[in-house]
């Protein structure tokens, strides 16, 4: 009888400890950013692995569509880490609309990240174009210089989802056939271009944020102070003078200390709840 009791107690303890280990592994073994990226290209450039481990492939349009340019390699790119400036220094442009096709086989929530830097023009309204995603306009009148200035990194971030054979983006829905087409649309001002881009599974908060832009932050703070100091009439005036195209350089970095670890408490309590009575029974035997 004692042997049977000891055997059962040991099995209970092992089961509780296994449950604890599995939960801890699930919490700490979440996919890294690089593992969630399903497709990445360094437009107009060669392969590159960035500081987050994302592996950008060589431009598949080389020799097929548009022209590659490395004009920006002579310039330092603000807001980008030194290791990843090459992603903003090279680019592909075309005198007409062009784009890339991204195969997507699984349903879920995705993010398209497009990297830009204006390395040629020194004023706004010189290069303006749209970006389409499977026919949906997701970026309208993109003027890189107007957004961030010269030789400065800028990321356009577009969340979308694929569910039940439908693509949903910016409140619009269309049939999805397994290929995501990202198009850079020729406008009235110069040629459309792209420096680098990638598609990843996840949410907006999963996208790495660019380094701060002092000029933009100062302008945003001044606008906030004006809005706080004015009444209803001032609010109307502030709204009319606000920039037409807000800067989209990525979501705010999540606070790592705000993570809820309550999911770990249950298996720990279970383990102790099983271990202590078992130990007590063993001592009595």
Swiss-Prot record:
Residues in the signal sequence: 1-26
Disordered, as annotated region: 209-258
Protein's UniProt name: Malectin
Membrane topology reported for the UniProt record: Single-pass type I membrane protein
InterPro entries on file: Malectin_dom (IPR021720), MLEC (IPR039155)
Domain of life: Eukaryota
Residues annotated as glycosylated: 261
Transmembrane segments: 263-283
Entries under Pfam families matching the protein: Malectin
Topology, Cytoplasmic side: 284-285
Compartment annotation: Endoplasmic reticulum membrane
Organism: Danio rerio
Gene that encodes the chain: mlec
């Amino acid at each position: 009888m004692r042997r049977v009791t000891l055997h059962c107690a040991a099995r209970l303890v092992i089961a509780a400890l296994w449950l604890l280990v599995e939960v801890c592994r699930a919490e700490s073994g979440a996919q890294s950013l690089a593992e969630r990226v399903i497709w990445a290209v360094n437009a107009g450039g060669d392969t590159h692995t960035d500081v987050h481990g994302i592996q950008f492939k060589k431009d598949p349009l080389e020799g097929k569509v548009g022209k590659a340019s490395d004009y920006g390699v002579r310039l330092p790119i603000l807001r980008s880490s030194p290791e990843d400036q090459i992603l903003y220094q090279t680019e592909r442009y075309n005198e007409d609309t062009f784009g890339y096709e991204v195969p997507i086989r699984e349903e879920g929530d995705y993010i398209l990240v497009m990297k830009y830097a204006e390395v040629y023009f020194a004023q706004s309204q010189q290069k303006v174009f749209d970006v389409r995603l499977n026919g949906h306009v997701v970026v309208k009148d993109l003027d890189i210089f107007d957004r961030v200035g010269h030789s400065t990194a800028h990321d356009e971030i577009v969340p979308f989802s694929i569910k039940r054979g439908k693509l949903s983006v910016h409140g619009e829905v269309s049939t999805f056939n397994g290929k995501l087409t990202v198009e850079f649309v020729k406008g009235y001002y110069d040629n459309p271009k792209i420096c680098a881009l990638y598609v990843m599974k996840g949410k907006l908060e999963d996208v790495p944020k660019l380094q701060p832009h002092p000029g933009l932050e100062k302008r945003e703070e001044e606008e906030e102070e004006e809005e706080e100091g004015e009444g209803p009439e001032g609010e109307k005036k502030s709204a009319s003078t606000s920039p037409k195209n807000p800067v989209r350089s990525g979501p705010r970095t999540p606070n790592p200390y705000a993570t809820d670890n309550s999911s770990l408490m249950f298996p720990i309590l279970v383990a102790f709840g099983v271990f202590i009575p078992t130990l007590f029974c063993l001592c009595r035997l």
